[in-house]
Protein backbone atom coordinates (compact mmCIF):
# COMPACT_ATOMS: atom_id res chain seq x y z
CA UNK A 1 0.00 0.00 0.00
CA UNK A 2 1.26 3.52 -0.81
CA UNK A 3 2.97 4.78 2.32
CA UNK A 4 1.90 8.34 1.56
CA UNK A 5 -1.78 7.52 1.27
CA UNK A 6 -3.90 5.97 4.01
CA UNK A 7 -7.43 4.98 2.94
CA UNK A 8 -9.97 6.06 5.55
CA UNK A 9 -11.98 3.39 7.39
CA UNK A 10 -10.49 0.82 5.03
CA UNK A 11 -11.25 -2.37 6.95
CA UNK A 12 -14.71 -1.16 7.95
CA UNK A 13 -15.56 -0.43 4.31
CA UNK A 14 -14.29 -3.75 3.01
CA UNK A 15 -15.99 -5.76 5.75
CA UNK A 16 -19.35 -4.03 5.22
CA UNK A 17 -19.34 -4.39 1.43
CA UNK A 18 -19.56 -8.20 1.81
CA UNK A 19 -17.39 -8.67 -1.29
CA UNK A 20 -18.16 -11.68 -3.49
CA UNK A 21 -15.30 -13.05 -5.62
CA UNK A 22 -17.52 -12.96 -8.73
CA UNK A 23 -19.25 -9.65 -7.95
CA UNK A 24 -19.26 -6.30 -9.72
CA UNK A 25 -18.26 -3.31 -7.59
CA UNK A 26 -18.05 0.45 -8.08
CA UNK A 27 -15.53 2.69 -6.37
CA UNK A 28 -16.98 6.06 -7.31
CA UNK A 29 -14.13 8.04 -5.75
CA UNK A 30 -11.04 6.17 -6.91
CA UNK A 31 -8.45 8.60 -5.53
CA UNK A 32 -5.12 6.86 -4.99
CA UNK A 33 -6.80 3.46 -5.32
CA UNK A 34 -6.39 2.31 -1.73
CA UNK A 35 -9.96 1.08 -1.28
CA UNK A 36 -10.05 -0.24 -4.86
CA UNK A 37 -6.89 -2.26 -4.34
CA UNK A 38 -8.47 -4.10 -1.42
CA UNK A 39 -11.71 -4.72 -3.31
CA UNK A 40 -9.94 -5.95 -6.47
CA UNK A 41 -7.74 -8.22 -4.38
CA UNK A 42 -10.84 -10.10 -3.23
CA UNK A 43 -12.17 -10.69 -6.74
CA UNK A 44 -11.48 -13.75 -8.87
CA UNK A 45 -13.91 -13.49 -11.78
CA UNK A 46 -15.52 -10.24 -10.63
CA UNK A 47 -15.04 -6.67 -11.86
CA UNK A 48 -14.23 -3.37 -10.20
CA UNK A 49 -15.29 -0.11 -11.86
CA UNK A 50 -13.16 2.79 -10.59
CA UNK A 51 -14.45 6.32 -11.26
CA UNK A 52 -12.71 9.65 -10.63
CA UNK A 53 -13.06 13.15 -12.05
CA UNK A 54 -9.35 13.81 -11.43
CA UNK A 55 -7.24 12.54 -14.34
CA UNK A 56 -4.12 12.62 -12.17
CA UNK A 57 -5.82 10.23 -9.76
CA UNK A 58 -6.83 7.94 -12.64
CA UNK A 59 -3.21 7.76 -13.82
CA UNK A 60 -1.78 7.05 -10.36
CA UNK A 61 -4.43 4.52 -9.41
CA UNK A 62 -4.10 2.88 -12.82
CA UNK A 63 -0.46 2.10 -12.15
CA UNK A 64 -1.29 0.78 -8.70
CA UNK A 65 -4.12 -1.43 -9.95
CA UNK A 66 -2.38 -2.65 -13.11
CA UNK A 67 -1.55 -6.08 -11.58
CA UNK A 68 -5.28 -6.87 -11.48
CA UNK A 69 -5.56 -6.62 -15.25
CA UNK A 70 -9.04 -6.85 -16.75
CA UNK A 71 -10.65 -7.21 -13.34
CA UNK A 72 -10.39 -3.41 -13.06
CA UNK A 73 -11.92 -0.82 -15.40
CA UNK A 74 -11.12 2.85 -14.77
CA UNK A 75 -13.34 5.70 -15.95
CA UNK A 76 -12.62 9.43 -15.97
CA UNK A 77 -15.93 10.84 -14.85
CA UNK A 78 -18.00 12.25 -12.02
CA UNK A 79 -19.67 9.91 -9.54
CA UNK A 80 -22.88 11.89 -10.00
CA UNK A 81 -23.01 10.17 -13.41
CA UNK A 82 -22.57 6.64 -12.02
CA UNK A 83 -25.85 5.39 -13.51
CA UNK A 84 -24.95 6.72 -16.98
CA UNK A 85 -21.41 5.32 -16.73
CA UNK A 86 -22.71 1.85 -15.87
CA UNK A 87 -25.22 2.08 -18.71
CA UNK A 88 -22.42 3.00 -21.11
CA UNK A 89 -20.43 -0.02 -19.92
CA UNK A 90 -23.45 -2.28 -20.45
CA UNK A 91 -23.79 -3.05 -16.73
CA UNK A 92 -27.33 -3.17 -15.36
CA UNK A 93 -26.70 -4.05 -11.73
CA UNK A 94 -23.78 -4.23 -9.31
CA UNK A 95 -23.06 -5.92 -5.99
CA UNK A 96 -21.63 -2.95 -4.16
CA UNK A 97 -20.80 0.75 -4.36
CA UNK A 98 -18.32 2.80 -2.35
CA UNK A 99 -18.10 6.59 -2.25
CA UNK A 100 -15.40 8.34 -0.19
CA UNK A 101 -16.49 11.97 -0.39
CA UNK A 102 -14.63 15.26 -0.23
CA UNK A 103 -11.14 16.34 -1.19
CA UNK A 104 -8.43 13.67 -1.20
CA UNK A 105 -5.15 13.86 0.70
CA UNK A 106 -3.08 14.04 -2.52
CA UNK A 107 -5.19 16.97 -3.72
CA UNK A 108 -4.54 18.77 -0.43
CA UNK A 109 -0.85 17.95 -0.55
CA UNK A 110 -0.31 19.05 -4.16
CA UNK A 111 0.27 22.73 -3.53
CA UNK A 112 -0.46 23.87 -7.08
CA UNK A 113 -4.04 22.56 -6.92
CA UNK A 114 -4.97 25.45 -4.61
CA UNK A 115 -6.96 23.49 -2.02
CA UNK A 116 -4.79 24.32 0.99
CA UNK A 117 -4.64 27.50 3.04
CA UNK A 118 -1.23 26.44 4.38
CA UNK A 119 0.74 26.95 1.16
CA UNK A 120 0.69 29.63 -1.50
CA UNK A 121 -0.77 28.64 -4.87
CA UNK A 122 -3.13 29.98 -7.53
CA UNK A 123 -6.78 29.93 -6.44
CA UNK A 124 -8.04 26.82 -8.23
CA UNK A 125 -9.67 24.08 -6.09
CA UNK A 126 -10.98 22.10 -9.06
CA UNK A 127 -11.13 18.36 -8.48
CA UNK A 128 -11.59 17.98 -12.24
CA UNK A 129 -8.89 20.15 -13.80
CA UNK A 130 -10.81 20.22 -17.09
CA UNK A 131 -13.78 21.96 -15.44
CA UNK A 132 -14.33 25.66 -16.13
CA UNK A 133 -15.17 27.11 -12.71
CA UNK A 134 -12.25 27.89 -10.37
CA UNK A 135 -12.00 29.35 -6.89
CA UNK A 136 -10.50 32.50 -8.44
CA UNK A 137 -13.71 33.07 -10.38
CA UNK A 138 -15.90 32.47 -7.34
CA UNK A 139 -13.88 34.84 -5.15
CA UNK A 140 -13.53 37.61 -7.73
CA UNK A 141 -16.87 37.58 -9.56
CA UNK A 142 -19.59 36.30 -7.23
CA UNK A 143 -21.72 38.98 -5.58
CA UNK A 144 -21.52 39.78 -1.88
CA UNK A 145 -24.82 37.94 -1.32
CA UNK A 146 -23.62 34.85 -3.19
CA UNK A 147 -20.35 34.78 -1.25
CA UNK A 148 -22.10 35.28 2.08
CA UNK A 149 -24.53 32.45 1.32
CA UNK A 150 -21.77 30.07 0.20
CA UNK A 151 -19.63 30.79 3.27
CA UNK A 152 -22.57 30.42 5.64
CA UNK A 153 -24.31 27.41 4.06
CA UNK A 154 -21.32 25.39 2.87
CA UNK A 155 -18.78 26.41 5.50
CA UNK A 156 -21.18 26.99 8.41
CA UNK A 157 -19.03 30.10 8.96
CA UNK A 158 -20.60 32.44 11.52
CA UNK A 159 -18.48 35.36 10.30
CA UNK A 160 -19.66 34.91 6.70
CA UNK A 161 -21.04 38.48 6.30
CA UNK A 162 -17.80 40.10 7.47
CA UNK A 163 -15.61 37.79 5.37
CA UNK A 164 -17.71 38.27 2.22
CA UNK A 165 -17.61 42.05 2.72
CA UNK A 166 -13.82 42.04 3.16
CA UNK A 167 -13.34 39.90 0.04
CA UNK A 168 -15.43 42.35 -1.99
CA UNK A 169 -13.46 45.31 -0.63
CA UNK A 170 -10.10 43.75 -1.51
CA UNK A 171 -11.05 42.71 -5.03
CA UNK A 172 -12.10 46.28 -5.83
CA UNK A 173 -8.42 47.22 -5.54
CA UNK A 174 -7.07 44.21 -7.46
CA UNK A 175 -8.09 40.60 -8.18
CA UNK A 176 -7.44 38.04 -5.45
CA UNK A 177 -5.07 35.52 -7.02
CA UNK A 178 -3.58 33.14 -4.45
CA UNK A 179 -4.54 30.93 -1.53
CA UNK A 180 -2.44 32.73 1.07
CA UNK A 181 -3.74 36.09 -0.12
CA UNK A 182 -7.30 34.83 0.39
CA UNK A 183 -6.42 33.28 3.77
CA UNK A 184 -4.99 36.62 4.96
CA UNK A 185 -8.14 38.46 3.83
CA UNK A 186 -10.33 35.97 5.70
CA UNK A 187 -8.18 36.32 8.82
CA UNK A 188 -8.38 40.12 8.67
CA UNK A 189 -12.20 39.98 8.72
CA UNK A 190 -12.43 37.88 11.89
CA UNK A 191 -12.44 39.11 15.50
CA UNK A 192 -9.46 38.45 17.75
CA UNK A 193 -11.43 35.85 19.73
CA UNK A 194 -11.92 33.74 16.58
CA UNK A 195 -8.22 33.90 15.76
CA UNK A 196 -7.42 32.32 19.13
CA UNK A 197 -9.42 29.19 18.29
CA UNK A 198 -7.56 25.96 17.58
CA UNK A 199 -9.01 25.70 14.06
CA UNK A 200 -7.31 27.68 11.29
CA UNK A 201 -9.41 30.81 10.61
CA UNK A 202 -9.63 30.05 6.88
CA UNK A 203 -10.67 26.40 7.21
CA UNK A 204 -14.44 26.85 6.96
CA UNK A 205 -14.25 29.42 4.17
CA UNK A 206 -11.92 27.29 2.07
CA UNK A 207 -14.24 24.31 2.54
CA UNK A 208 -17.20 26.42 1.45
CA UNK A 209 -15.51 27.74 -1.69
CA UNK A 210 -14.27 24.27 -2.62
CA UNK A 211 -17.78 22.84 -2.26
CA UNK A 212 -19.14 25.60 -4.49
CA UNK A 213 -16.44 25.12 -7.15
CA UNK A 214 -17.05 21.38 -7.36
CA UNK A 215 -20.81 21.32 -6.63
CA UNK A 216 -20.08 18.69 -4.01
CA UNK A 217 -23.50 18.73 -2.39
CA UNK A 218 -25.36 18.79 -5.70
CA UNK A 219 -23.64 15.55 -6.68
CA UNK A 220 -25.01 13.56 -3.77
CA UNK A 221 -28.68 13.07 -4.80
CA UNK A 222 -27.88 11.59 -8.25
CA UNK A 223 -25.17 9.42 -6.66
CA UNK A 224 -27.65 8.03 -4.14
CA UNK A 225 -30.28 7.59 -6.86
CA UNK A 226 -27.75 5.52 -8.84
CA UNK A 227 -27.23 3.28 -5.84
CA UNK A 228 -30.97 2.75 -5.50
CA UNK A 229 -31.30 2.00 -9.22
CA UNK A 230 -28.20 -0.08 -9.93
CA UNK A 231 -27.57 -2.14 -6.80
CA UNK A 232 -28.72 -5.76 -6.94
CA UNK A 233 -30.97 -6.99 -4.12
CA UNK A 234 -28.56 -7.66 -1.27
CA UNK A 235 -26.00 -5.29 -2.80
CA UNK A 236 -24.46 -2.76 -0.45
CA UNK A 237 -23.75 0.95 -0.52
CA UNK A 238 -20.96 2.41 1.64
CA UNK A 239 -20.57 6.20 1.89
CA UNK A 240 -17.84 8.03 3.81
CA UNK A 241 -18.59 11.67 4.63
CA UNK A 242 -16.29 14.27 6.19
CA UNK A 243 -18.57 17.08 7.29
CA UNK A 244 -22.08 17.51 8.61
CA UNK A 245 -23.54 18.90 5.37
CA UNK A 246 -22.66 15.76 3.41
CA UNK A 247 -23.64 13.44 6.24
CA UNK A 248 -27.01 15.12 6.67
CA UNK A 249 -27.91 14.61 3.00
CA UNK A 250 -26.77 10.98 2.97
CA UNK A 251 -28.49 10.15 6.26
CA UNK A 252 -31.79 11.74 5.20
CA UNK A 253 -31.87 9.98 1.82
CA UNK A 254 -31.04 6.57 3.29
CA UNK A 255 -33.70 6.99 5.97
CA UNK A 256 -36.26 7.85 3.27
CA UNK A 257 -35.29 4.77 1.25
CA UNK A 258 -35.49 2.58 4.35
CA UNK A 259 -39.00 3.74 5.26
CA UNK A 260 -41.83 1.30 4.69
CA UNK A 261 -45.54 1.83 5.23
CA UNK A 262 -46.56 5.46 5.75
CA UNK A 263 -50.23 4.82 6.48
CA UNK A 264 -51.66 6.50 9.61
CA UNK A 265 -51.23 4.27 12.68
CA UNK A 266 -55.00 3.92 13.09
CA UNK A 267 -55.32 2.12 9.73
CA UNK A 268 -55.86 -1.62 10.41
CA UNK A 269 -54.02 -2.63 7.20
CA UNK A 270 -51.56 -0.96 4.88
CA UNK A 271 -53.13 0.72 1.87
CA UNK A 272 -50.16 2.79 0.70
CA UNK A 273 -48.21 -0.24 -0.51
CA UNK A 274 -44.90 1.42 0.27
CA UNK A 275 -42.06 -0.99 1.01
CA UNK A 276 -38.50 -0.25 2.15
CA UNK A 277 -36.02 -0.01 -0.72
CA UNK A 278 -32.95 -0.42 1.48
CA UNK A 279 -32.10 -1.79 4.90
CA UNK A 280 -29.86 0.36 7.09
CA UNK A 281 -26.84 -1.70 8.11
CA UNK A 282 -25.52 1.12 10.27
CA UNK A 283 -28.16 2.94 12.33
CA UNK A 284 -25.35 5.13 13.63
CA UNK A 285 -22.31 5.93 11.48
CA UNK A 286 -19.06 4.05 11.92
CA UNK A 287 -16.21 6.36 12.93
CA UNK A 288 -12.44 5.80 13.06
CA UNK A 289 -10.93 4.25 16.16
CA UNK A 290 -8.07 5.75 18.13
CA UNK A 291 -5.48 3.59 16.35
CA UNK A 292 -6.53 4.91 12.94
CA UNK A 293 -6.64 8.50 14.19
CA UNK A 294 -3.11 8.18 15.54
CA UNK A 295 -1.92 6.97 12.14
CA UNK A 296 -4.10 9.32 10.08
CA UNK A 297 -5.38 12.45 11.90
CA UNK A 298 -7.18 13.59 8.73
CA UNK A 299 -9.70 10.79 9.32
CA UNK A 300 -11.02 12.47 12.47
CA UNK A 301 -14.28 13.75 10.98
CA UNK A 302 -14.99 10.68 8.81
CA UNK A 303 -18.33 8.88 9.12
CA UNK A 304 -19.26 5.67 7.29
CA UNK A 305 -22.88 4.82 6.56
CA UNK A 306 -23.89 1.50 4.99
CA UNK A 307 -27.18 0.35 3.47
CA UNK A 308 -28.29 -2.84 1.71
CA UNK A 309 -30.68 -2.96 -1.25
CA UNK A 310 -33.90 -4.82 -0.44
Residue ranges and their predicted role:
Residues 1-310:
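S-adenosyl-L-methionine-dependent methyltransferase catalytic core, i.e., the SAM/SAH-binding region
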Amino acid sequence: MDAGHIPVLLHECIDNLNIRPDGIYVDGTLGMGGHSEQIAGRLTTGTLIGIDRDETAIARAGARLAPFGERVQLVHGNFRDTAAILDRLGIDAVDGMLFDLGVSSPQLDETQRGFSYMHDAPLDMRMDESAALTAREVVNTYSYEELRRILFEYGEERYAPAIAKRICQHREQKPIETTLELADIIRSAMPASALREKQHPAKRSFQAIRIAVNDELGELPPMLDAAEKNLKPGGRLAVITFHSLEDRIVKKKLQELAQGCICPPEFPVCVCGRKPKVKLITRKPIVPGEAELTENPRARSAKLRVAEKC
